[in-house]
Amino acid sequence: GHVAALRYLREHTGLLTVNLGTGQPVSVLEMVRGFQQASGQAVPYRVVARRPGDVAQCWADPALAERLLGWRARHGVDRMCADVWRWQNGVARTLA
């Protein structure tokens, strides 16, 4: 998605927000579990009642990414968490 966005910017100017999600809802707990699996470490969390004003559900609409960039997410949350974990660890090593 990010590479497709950079290619798009070669030929277009201006600012644009494009969601690079799958279009499928993912809970916070699913994200926690995905990063636990990717890192091999426990991620501390607490399940508490929703606070006033908390959004019940929200997820990305990827239609614009597909239309403008010709890009569509191919992986689920576990693979995405693993990719982010791997990338972040690589960045940390280069900055150390």
Residue ranges, per PLM feature:
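C-terminal substrate-binding subdomain of Rossmann-fold SDR/epimerase-dehydratase oxidoreductases
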Residues: G1-A96
